[in-house]
């Protein structure tokens, strides 16, 4: 286990995939050629299937396009299954893939419950399972994603810093995503731990939009009508929260209501920052997450361990981004293909 974890650190820090396979070079006299031979045996020709909650969102598309590019270079067969926000369909796709028996499944859970049993069955069938950003209640071989409690705390502290001083109404509103997802639960827990320390902050609305831009827009419009002196809106995902931004602009409150959001640095986040529609975006870089998912998948394939042996977590760093520090590389363009 120590060797696996040490290798994981090397993989993620340097992009190096040589420390697994047959073991340390110095200890066993392995040559670079022998390591490459073992790597080819363990990795090349293997199959990875990626099942996001939808492939029609910029975030999940960035993950898929980046992983597909890496897989092509590594000689890994990579495919994508799109349930298009249909939870029942996602469960059916996962069950179908278990029967097809790929080497690795990369799964994006809509909530903590619905895919848990299927993920466990996948491991029992000899398939490695990597969960991304939204974990299930079942711990699979690996989790890659932002640490949601930390994310929620960081965002809430930003809200407090912006709205806790004199001259502010101290009123804020929250826009959750899917309330039963581990990601949403963690953000809420982290945020509330901060807000409880600042009783001057008044939460006038706490609603959920289920990741839907229009729902977020409509609910925000109602809140803004009731509270035109709102100081800030804190949302759980930039794709959803673009609807809040439009509601703020339509209400004539641009520059008055500060929108705090988060996401993988996908469009239109950076454009919204430079235009003043978003105040601060707590970015967990989507391309880095894709790199992490592929590195972990390679590690598992080379480990020789039975699926279900390891429970590894790899947390993506959070990059607070505003109009002052946003750059051309802060966000990732996404292809429509």
Kindly give the residue locations of the regions a language model identified:
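Hydrophobic alpha-helical
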Residues: 104-124, 191, 209-271
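Hinge/cleft segment of the Venus flytrap/periplasmic-binding protein
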Residues: 28-46, 175, 179, 183, ...
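Extracytoplasmic "Venus flytrap"
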Residues: 30-66, 70, 74, 78-92, ...
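Short beta-strand elements in bilobed, periplasmic/extracellular small-molecule ligand-binding domains
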Residues: 72-83, 171-174, 195-213
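Short beta-strand elements at the ligand-binding edges of bilobed clamshell
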Residues: 80, 136-161, 174-176, 206, ...
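Hydrophobic alpha-helical segments within soluble ligand-binding/sensing domains
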Residues: 35, 42, 90, 144-170, ...
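Short, solvent-exposed amphipathic alpha-helices that sit
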Residues: 59-73, 151-158, 182-201, 215, ...
């Amino acid at each position: 286990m120590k060797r696996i974890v040490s290798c994981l650190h090397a993989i993620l820090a340097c992009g190096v995939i040589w420390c697994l396979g047959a073991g340390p070079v110095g200890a066993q006299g392995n040559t670079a050629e022998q390591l490459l031979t073992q790597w080819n045996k363990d990795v090349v020709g293997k199959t990875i299937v990626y099942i996001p909650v939808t492939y029609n969102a910029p975030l999940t598309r960035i993950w898929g396009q980046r992983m597909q590019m890496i897989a092509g270079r590594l000689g890994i067969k990579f495919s994508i299954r799109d349930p298009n926000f249909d939870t029942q369909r996602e469960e059916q796709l996962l069950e179908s893939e278990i029967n097809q028996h790929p080497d690795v499944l990369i799964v994006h859970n809509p909530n903590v419950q619905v895919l848990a049993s299927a993920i466990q069955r996948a491991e029992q069938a000899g398939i490695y399972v990597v969960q991304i950003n939204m974990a299930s209640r079942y711990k699979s071989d690996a989790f890659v994603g932002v640490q949601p409690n930390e994310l929620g705390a960081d965002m809430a502290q930003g809200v407090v810093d912006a709205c806790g001083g004199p001259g502010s109404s101290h009123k804020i509103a929250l826009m959750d995503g899917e309330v039963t997802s581990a990601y949403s639960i963690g953000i809420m827990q982290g945020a509330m731990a901060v807000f409880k320390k600042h009783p001057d902050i008044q939460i006038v609305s706490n609603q959920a939009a289920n990741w839907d831009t229009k729902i977020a827009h409509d609910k925000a419009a109602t809140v803004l009508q009731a509270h035109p002196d709102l100081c800030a809106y804190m949302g759980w995902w930039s794709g959803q929260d673009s609807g809040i931004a439009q509601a703020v602009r339509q209400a004539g409150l641009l520059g008055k209501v500060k929108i705090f959001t988060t996401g993988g640095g996908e469009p239109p986040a950076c454009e919204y920052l430079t235009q003043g529609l978003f105040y601060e975006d707590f970015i967990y870089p989507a391309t880095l997450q894709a790199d992490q998912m592929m590195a972990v998948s390679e590690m598992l394939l080379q480990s020789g361990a039975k699926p279900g042996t390891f429970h590894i977590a790899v947390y993506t760093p959070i990059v607070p981004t505003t109009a002052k520090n946003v750059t051309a590389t802060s966000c990732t363009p996404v292809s429509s293909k």
